[in-house]
Amino acid sequence: MKLKGTITALVTPFCKNGTVDYGALKALVEEQTSAGIEGICSVGTSGESPTLSHDEHHEVIAKTIEYAAGKCKIVAGTGANSTSEALSLTKAVIEMGGADATLQVTPYYNKPNSEGLYRHFMTVADLGLPVILYNVPGRAGKEIPLDVVVRLAKHPNVVAIKEAAGSVERVSAIKNVLPDFTVLSGDDSLTLPMISVGAEGVISVASNLIPREMSDMVRMALAGDFAGALKYHRKYYNLFHDLFIDVNPVMVKEALWLMGKFERVFRLPLCETDDAKLELCGATLESLSIEAYRTVIPVPLRSFFSS
């Protein structure tokens, strides 16, 4: 299986009482598929996977598959820092059917050595569902070494890697030794540079807000129209930046709340951002003519970075 284009790292909306808002989830999925997105990643980092129970985890993925069936690729976030837990979550997705691949994060906190990483990912890949490796050292505390990626890429079910290390050089290094192995950007602001050295797309946070625009930008770049893609990049760069002025997925959920998509509810230890960041987010949306229904105090777009 070949993955390419824009895959949205979909958020998980909550009701006022803290339960999953499946009505809002359905609306989000329908908006994504109507915009022509290539894929949806359910219950990854942006989906607040660490605070979902296993039952909720299964249900959110199942509902996403139901709502998006036949309209785009579905990637299920089933990674964990325990191999047995990753196996359990992945087996549940295989049993429900409908997912095209799983996203497997680098085991975090316990920081396994290279051989442990290799065995972990290989064990999950042996289940049969295609695997996207997720290299995110800022969260995992450890990078997947290049030699381990090379070994894993020999497995027929290891089909791609999501690169969220903030390094175009690393993408170059991967493509230099694995020219046919799929690399997906994990950073919206680095998507164009990564495509320029061989990446095939992005697992995007910003596409929660601008799915059609992100898809258009990536398609242009993949078709070789970097001048056209660069216009999108420059137009939305401030948005890419501002979605990470607080920890993800706080700012993208704040933006969706400002747009009236769902309630302003997080699960601890995540919580709302501060007023200054919220105002900046609202100003960014307004500057891009992205409709915001809530009222925020108008501020100059870049005023918080002028000191």
For each feature predicted by the language model, list its residue ranges.
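Alpha-helix N-capping/helix-start residues
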Residues: 16, 22, 54, 146, ...
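Catalytic alpha/beta core domains of metabolic enzymes, predominantly
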Residues: 127-129, 139-244
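C-terminal alpha-helical cap/extension of soluble enzyme domains
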Residues: 2, 7-13, 35-37, 46, ...
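A general structural signal for well-ordered alpha-helical segments in protein cores
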Residues: 25, 57, 61, 86, ...
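Active-site beta->alpha loop and helix N-cap motifs at the rims of alpha/beta catalytic domains
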Residues: 2-141
